């Protein structure tokens, strides 16, 4: 190992700068802190296509949810929000999003966000130019473990078909001071540990 590589490793391990991570730093956290892993052996992490200069591309998995019409005709945040059963994209092998339709999809990537790190998710430009918006709540807190549920909305006048492994979003990472309360511990962490696409659990917030 080169001296420069040793210095870089020590810097990342003990003196990580509080800044937006670049490709080399993201790769370091993946390889040394298991910050990102794949939940599907058919789709291992692919640095060549996914690792960008300051971000990491996210691919849709095989788990999908569509909202179901509430019996009252109103979505009430005090009550569990009704969704259709989670279904797999493995059969027929794709998902078609109709114009004006909103769906939830999981990512193939599972995250283990260390304390002192946060992620920001946003859509890819190539996807947005088709009229498909990624409406995800973009902050991924320190301590979060699990896949990300992406919220996709088709604003185009045409149906859009996606396949497992399609890169639809990207995540940026920035380092911060360590938190006293991380996601998953000592707080209402409703989505920690999620692997499949997960609907809203906002009713847990209402006391």
Regions found by a protein language model. Name each.
Residues 1-207:
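Non-catalytic terminal segments and appended small domains
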């Amino acid at each position: 190992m080169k001296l420069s590589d040793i210095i870089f490793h020590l810097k990342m391990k003990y003196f990580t700068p509080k800044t937006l991570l670049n490709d080399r730093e993201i790769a370091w956290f993946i390889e040394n802190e298991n910050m990102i892993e794949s939940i599907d052996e058919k789709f291992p992490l692919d640095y060549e296509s996914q690792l960008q200069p300051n971000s990491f591309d996210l691919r849709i998995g095989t788990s999908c949810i569509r909202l179901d019409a509430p019996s009252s005709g109103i979505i009430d945040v005090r009550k569990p929000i009704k969704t259709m059963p989670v279904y797999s994209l493995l059969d027929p092998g794709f998902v078609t999003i109709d114009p004006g339709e909103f769906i939830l999809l999981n990512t193939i990537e599972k995250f283990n966000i260390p304390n002192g790190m946060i992620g920001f998710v946003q859509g890819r430009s190539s996807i947005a130019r088709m009229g498909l918006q990624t409406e995800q709540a973009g902050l991924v807190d320190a301590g979060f473990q699990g896949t990300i549920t992406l919220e996709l909305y088709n604003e185009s006048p045409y149906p859009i078909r996606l396949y497992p492994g399609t890169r639809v979003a990207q995540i940026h990472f920035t380092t911060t001071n360590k938190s006293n309360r991380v996601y998953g511990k000592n707080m209402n962490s409703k989505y920690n540990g999620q692997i499949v696409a997960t609907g809203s659990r906002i009713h847990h917030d209402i006391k």
